[in-house]
Amino acid sequence: MADFLLRATAAAEGIRAVGVITTQLTDEARKRHQLSYVATAALGRTMAAGLILASSFKQPQARVNVRIQGNGPLGTIFADAGADGTVRGYVQYPSVELPPNAKGKLDVGAAVGHQGYLYVIHDLGYGYPYSSTVELVSGEIAEDITYYLATSEQTPSALMLGVFVEESGVTAAGGLMLQVLPKAANDEHLIATLEQRVANLKGFTPLLQAGRTLPDIFQELLGDMDLQILPQRQMVRFHCGCSHERMLAALKLLGEAELRDILATEAKAEATCQFCNAVYWADQPMLEQLIAELATASV
């Protein structure tokens, strides 16, 4: 089944729920970046979180950047997600692998680092982007995003993120967020009930592996709270907007002198997209054409 995002409300629209299945797009990122098991889990969680955060935008061109800079060996983890359902991302050190944690699971927290910062940038596609920064809580990503939502957006939230990786690839990935909206923010009993129910689930990917669907999970959490599942599913996918044309435009920014030096020493130029690992080339005729265009423009 294709990856998708599903929305719901409950408690007379006092609760907002968003769930996303990202199995295929996470495996696409794994293959493109040749990610280790723990790097796959870290980037998969971050991309799912980005899609969930971006789902609140009404502007289709709006995007969210999630950057995690921890003191663990993975280095920077970055995801760029759009309200249109597209997402891309990378891990600075994609081949890092660690032993399982005490529970026998991928040690994402240690790989990310227990200290560091989470940066979130909202870009609506017009005006100036706005950003927030919070310290990492655990490096497990879901807890860090939850802390960001509570401190920077002042929205009580519960977030679950998960990626299950086998030798054959990613077999389950996604996330679920429940938010208590302002109209229900003072209902302490409601908040306590949600927290307990989320805690009882004991993980997101085990539910997917057991054959549970997003509507099933929504029903278990919110079925007795006037649950309203929105009928339209939004397709989500790994997508990068890089292209050969953009690579050539970037080369032109180097200037005529730098391009002449590249032409004389290498006779070609190569660029690898950080987000999708696509490789683009500019051969000698292309470099000569760029130099000619710059020379003409300077006359």
Swiss-Prot record:
Keywords tagged on the record: Chaperone, Cytoplasm, Disulfide bond, Redox-active center, Zinc
Gene3D superfamilies: Hsp33 domain (3.55.30.10), HSP33 redox switch-like (3.90.1280.10)
Domain of life: Bacteria
GO molecular-function term, one example from the UniProt record: unfolded protein binding
Cited Pfam families: HSP33
Keyword Disulfide bond: yes
The record's account of how the chain is modified after translation: Under oxidizing conditions two disulfide bonds are formed involving the reactive cysteines. Under reducing conditions zinc is bound to the reactive cysteines and the protein is inactive.
Biological process per Gene Ontology, one example term: protein refolding
GO cellular component, one term: cytoplasm
Disulfide-bonded cysteines: C240-C242, C273-C276
Record localization: Cytoplasm
InterPro entries, per the entry: Heat_shock_Hsp33, Heat_shock_Hsp33_C, Heat_shock_Hsp33_N
Role, per record: Redox regulated molecular chaperone. Protects both thermally unfolding and oxidatively damaged proteins from irreversible aggregation. Plays an important role in the bacterial defense system toward oxidative stress.
HAMAP family: HslO
Family to which this protein belongs: Belongs to the HSP33 family.
PANTHER family tied to this protein: 33 KDA CHAPERONIN
This protein's name: 33 kDa chaperonin
